């Protein structure tokens, strides 16, 4: 039996991926992923991270965001990261592998955070996409709602939240909820984010607690 041919869409995605200048740049600089550059651009405009901060990273693998934040918060800072996928260790990152939707995993994550509050919650979580927006968008919205729930449990007053959201049904309501909880809310589309993608990043600062 011959090898199954790739679909036209998957072949196009692979072609785009390897030609992407940010993918090439990440490879050249030995970075975990192109997501590093998305967060770098957000940091240049919104200044979320400072030395000594404690940060929660949801959907952390392969580690692009954690890798970036380590460079910003330094040795006195702390990152608690979680993903359903494996992630190679990063110095300064306390990584928990497990499904964030599972109550036991959530409890373990909260235990690692401890009694203190965190300065930033960030989420780059995304579901496995089927290609059907009617299925994919609700799955994605469920994940970002969980990320916001995490903020309500662990984020310090005046803390910050950055979350990847896919535009579609439920986006406007979600944005309204975030606006009610934070003093300043921006919607960013970093240059490293592909133009065809529905993804945007909500950057919220000044958590009202």
Swiss-Prot record:
Keyword match Cytoplasm: yes
EC code: 2.1.1.166
Top EC category: transferase
Function (record text): Specifically methylates the uridine in position 2552 of 23S rRNA at the 2'-O position of the ribose in the fully assembled 50S ribosomal subunit.
Keyword Phosphoprotein: no
Gene name, Swiss-Prot/TrEMBL: rlmE
Active site: 164
Family: Belongs to the class I-like SAM-binding methyltransferase superfamily. RNA methyltransferase RlmE family.
Catalysed conversion reaction: uridine(2552) in 23S rRNA + S-adenosyl-L-methionine = 2'-O-methyluridine(2552) in 23S rRNA + S-adenosyl-L-homocysteine + H(+)
InterPro entries on file: RNA_methyltr_RlmE, RNA_MeTrfase_FtsJ_dom, rRNA-MeTfrase_E, rRNA_MeTrfase_gammaproteobac, SAM-dependent_MTases_sf
Name of the protein this chain belongs to: Ribosomal RNA large subunit methyltransferase E
Ranges of residues in domain TRAM: 191-209
Native organism taxonomy: Bacteria, Pseudomonadati, Pseudomonadota, Gammaproteobacteria, Pasteurellales
Residues holding S-adenosyl-L-methionine: 63, 65, 83, 99, 124
Gene3D superfamilies named in the record: Vaccinia Virus protein VP39 (3.40.50.150)
Primary location recorded for the protein, binned into one broad class: cytoplasm
PANTHER family documented for this protein: RIBOSOMAL RNA METHYLTRANSFERASE, RRNA METHYLTRANSFERASE 2, MITOCHONDRIAL
GO molecular function, one term: rRNA (uridine-2'-O-)-methyltransferase activity
Listed GO CC annotations: cytoplasm
This protein's UniProt keywords: Cytoplasm, Methyltransferase, rRNA processing, S-adenosyl-L-methionine, Transferase
HAMAP family registered for this protein in UniProt: RNA_methyltr_E (MF_01547)
Subcellular location: Cytoplasm
């Amino acid at each position: 039996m011959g090898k199954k041919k790739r679909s036209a869409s998957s072949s196009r995605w692979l072609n785009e991926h390897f030609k992407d200048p940010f993918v090439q740049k990440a490879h050249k600089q030995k970075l975990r992923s192109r997501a590093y550059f998305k967060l770098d651009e957000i940091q240049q405009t919104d200044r979320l991270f400072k030395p000594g901060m404690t940060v929660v990273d949801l959907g952390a693998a392969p580690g692009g965001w954690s890798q970036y934040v380590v460079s910003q918060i330094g040795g006195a800072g702390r990152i608690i990261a979680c993903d359903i996928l494996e992630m190679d260790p990063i110095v300064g990152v306390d990584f928990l592998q497990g499904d964030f939707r599972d109550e036991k995993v959530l409890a373990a994550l909260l235990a690692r955070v401890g009694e203190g509050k965190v300065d930033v919650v960030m989420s780059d979580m995304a579901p496995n996409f089927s290609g059907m927006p009617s299925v994919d968008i609700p799955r994605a919205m469920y994940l970002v709602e969980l990320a916001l729930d995490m903020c309500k449990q662990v984020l310090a007053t005046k803390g910050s939240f950055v979350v990847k959201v896919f535009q579609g049904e439920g986006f406007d309501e979600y944005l309204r909820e975030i606006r009610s909880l934070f003093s300043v809310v921006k919607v960013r589309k970093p240059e490293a984010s592909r133009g065809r993608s529905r993804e945007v990043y909500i950057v919220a600062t000044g958590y009202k607690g």
